[in-house]
């Protein structure tokens, strides 16, 4: 329950009447924004400690000065407090908490919830919404290799539902024995579910159990004189036994362990996580953070909560976790909560020796190298931001930059891209594209006007307009953006700037225009601010090109058949329904195409020639 909901907050009275139960506290500033989230076994003691006399670091003192209100949530146990704290930090990202930004989003294998489920891969933490998840995997290539291996062993469908539902005959995967063809009823629900159950055990790391089960099924099928079925099981066993020496998932969980190394320098820290299976590093992940006012123990505490109590899906948990040296007593409760969540005891190794010490040193070397790269890159980026701020004559620091670029193919399939950079660097998750509609072919000015108008409208509603908006183009393009700014009255809220290549069209010689200023500016090609403008512009251009190519490709696939005289919408639908997609149609012979109702041999020949 949230204890305080009053508008007039009396801090003295609040502190005096605080409960001694465990729970989570939230510090809010005068704007009502959460600036810090913490948990405590004893809320009264912990919250009061912020306002008592005693040595405090500068970061804590600065935070306390901004506290206008405190809210608490009482939890049934310390474990629930850890979980709630972790979720609130991820949800609100308070500026005084230690925030971890993972270096990438990891892919998972997902088994869908369909009647005849498909197995596929999905990148991101929302994978669990798609079905039962296994992972995360180290990279896209590793998860694709796993999918390929699965297809060789388990004939479970991997096709999209749209393709699956349109089938009227088995596809090539059935012919090469990599699918049971549930799409056309060639397998019973029971048989499919049996294969699916074995696959799930395989992905969960129960390798020995899978071998035993398939072996038993093979012998049973042989005794029942179902020799074709026995041969299928035998083929599965052959492939599985070849994999025993290089299996995808670990089959001996007691040999799995995580190693967490921390390296600190100045006001920054880097965490390296090595995941070890059977003596091999199967994954390494890194986080770099602003650690001003923090020590190694507090960083480790925050990281363990973030990583092990978070919502990332995992199927195999380590029996051992090796840590950089920290104050053990300060994280004991957290360790117990982690063990409670995963339902197994963990051997925490804080003073490693022998081989364990070698693993820890390797993790710490990785952390140091990553931090060196991070601080060097961050320092360079900050110099560029400061230089751009100076050139644009801005009073406040630049927190968010957005850049627009237009791309089209011969005037069609027009796309506007918008890329986002913050004071931390490129924010890929915030990039987006706009499909431009209702304009004349190749009208870049109208495209810019439409894209900027849509962005400003949504930005005013969400209160997230950028500090600087860059337009790729010259005077004509920036004038379109200026018109939008006047329409919405934001001339003084966002600094507008454009970057045009001019007559020479040479990179490094671009002309710069500021919003509502007709002066043409140039900067030295090595100027840090100019380098940032070009960096952001190039990113927007790449983002636009990729989106435009996807759109053109999709349009081409759907129109290739339309160009053939005699193939209307009905015949096009019949072809797609019969073959399930353009790819299968492109592989079909003339005779196969002619089998489609309404398609003559002559027309089939024309369709075949379209693809060859």
UniProtKB/Swiss-Prot annotation:
InterPro entries: GIY-YIG_endonuc (IPR000305), GIY-YIG_endonuc_sf (IPR035901), GIY-YIG_UvrC_Cho (IPR047296), RuvA_2-like (IPR010994), UVR_dom (IPR001943), UVR_dom_sf (IPR036876), UvrABC_protein_C (IPR050066), UvrC (IPR004791). SMART domains: GIYc. Disulfide bonds: none annotated. One of its GO terms (biological process) is nucleotide-excision repair. Signal peptide: none annotated. SUPFAM superfamilies: C-terminal UvrC-binding domain of UvrB, GIY-YIG endonuclease, RuvA domain 2-like. It is found in: Cytoplasm. The keyword Repressor does not apply. Residues 20-98 form the GIY-YIG domain. Pfam families: GIY-YIG, HHH_5, UVR, UvrC_RNaseH, UvrC_RNaseH_dom. PROSITE patterns: GIY_YIG, UVR, UVRC. One of its GO terms (cellular component) is excinuclease repair complex. It comes from the Bacteria. Residues 208-243 form the UVR domain. GO terms for molecular function: DNA binding; excinuclease ABC activity. The keyword DNA repair applies. Keywords: Cytoplasm, DNA damage, DNA excision, DNA repair, Excision nuclease, SOS response. Belongs to the UvrC family. HAMAP family: UvrC. The UvrABC repair system catalyzes the recognition and processing of DNA lesions. UvrC both incises the 5' and 3' sides of the lesion. The N-terminal half is responsible for the 3' incision and the C-terminal half is responsible for the 5' incision. Interacts with UvrB in an incision complex. This is UvrABC system protein C. The lineage of its organism: Bacteria, Pseudomonadati, Pseudomonadota, Gammaproteobacteria, Thiotrichales.
């Amino acid at each position: 329950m949230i204890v305080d909901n009053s508008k007039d907050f009396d801090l003295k009275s609040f502190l005096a009447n605080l409960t001694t139960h465990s729970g989570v506290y939230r510090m809010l500033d005068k704007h009502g924004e959460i600036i810090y989230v913490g948990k405590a076994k004893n809320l009264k003691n912990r919250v009061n400690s912020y306002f008592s006399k005693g040595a405090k670091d500068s970061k804590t003192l600065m935070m306390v000065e901004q506290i206008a209100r405190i809210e608490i949530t009482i939890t049934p146990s310390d474990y629930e407090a850890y979980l709630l704290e972790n979720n609130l930090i991820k949800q609100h990202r308070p500026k005084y908490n230690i925030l971890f930004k993972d270096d990438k989003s990891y892919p998972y294998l997902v088994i869908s919830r369909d009647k005849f489920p498909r197995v596929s891969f999905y990148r991101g933490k929302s994978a669990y919404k798609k079905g039962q998840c296994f992972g995360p995997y180290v990279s896209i290539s590793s998860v694709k290799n796993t999918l390929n291996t699965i297809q060789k062993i388990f004939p479970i469908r991997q096709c999209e539902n749209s393709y699956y539902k349109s089938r009227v005959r088995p596809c090539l995967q059935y012919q090469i024995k990599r699918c049971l063809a549930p799409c056309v009823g060639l397998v019973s629900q029971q048989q499919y579910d049996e294969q699916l159950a074995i696959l799930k055990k395989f992905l969960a790391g129960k390798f020995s159990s899978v071998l035993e089960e398939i072996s038993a099924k093979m012998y049973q099928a042989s005794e029942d004189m179902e020799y074709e079925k026995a041969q299928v099981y035998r083929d599965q066993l052959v492939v599985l036994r070849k994999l025993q020496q290089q299996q995808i998932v670990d089959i001996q969980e007691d040999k799995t362990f995580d190693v967490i190394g921390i390296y600190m320098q100045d006001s920054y820290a880097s965490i390296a996580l090595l995941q070890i299976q059977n003596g091999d590093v199967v994954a390494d992940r890194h986080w770099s953070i602003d650690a001003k006012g923090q020590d190694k123990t507090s960083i480790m505490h925050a990281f363990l909560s973030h990583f092990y109590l978070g919502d990332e899906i995992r199927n195999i948990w380590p029996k051992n976790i090796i840590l950089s040296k920290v104050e053990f007593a300060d994280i004991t409760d957290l360790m117990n909560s982690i063990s409670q969540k995963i339902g197994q005891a963990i051997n925490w190794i804080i003073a490693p020796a022998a081989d364990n010490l070698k693993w820890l040193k390797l993790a710490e070397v990785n952390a140091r190298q990553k931090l060196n790269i991070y601080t060097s890159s961050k320092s360079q980026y900050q110099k560029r931001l400061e230089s751009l701020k100076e050139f644009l004559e801005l009073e406040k620091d630049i927190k968010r930059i957005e850049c627009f670029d237009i791309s089209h193919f011969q005037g069609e399939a027009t796309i506007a891209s918008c890329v986002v950079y913050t004071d931390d660097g490129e924010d890929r998750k915030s990039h987006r594209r706009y499909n431009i509609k209702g304009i004349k072919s190749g009208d870049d000015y109208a495209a810019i006007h439409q894209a900027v108008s849509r962005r400003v409208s949504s930005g005013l509603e969400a209160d997230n307009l950028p500090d600087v908006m860059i337009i790729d183009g010259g005077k004509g393009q920036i004038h379109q953006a200026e018109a939008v700014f006047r329409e919405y009255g934001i001339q003084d809220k966002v600094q507008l700037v454009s970057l045009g290549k001019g007559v020479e069209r040479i990179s490094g010689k671009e002309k710069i225009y500021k919003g509502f200023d007709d002066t043409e500016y140039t900067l030295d090609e090595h100027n840090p601010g100019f380098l940032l403008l070009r960096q952001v512009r190039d990113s927007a251009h790449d983002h636009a090109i990729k989106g435009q190519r996807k759109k053109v490709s999709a349009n081409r696939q759907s129109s290739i058949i339309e160009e053939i005289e005699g193939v209307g919408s009905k015949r096009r639908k019949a072809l797609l329904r019969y073959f399930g997609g353009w790819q299968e149609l492109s592989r079909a012979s003339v005779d196969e195409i002619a089998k489609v109702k309404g398609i003559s041999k002559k027309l089939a020949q024309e369709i075949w020639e379209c693809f060859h």
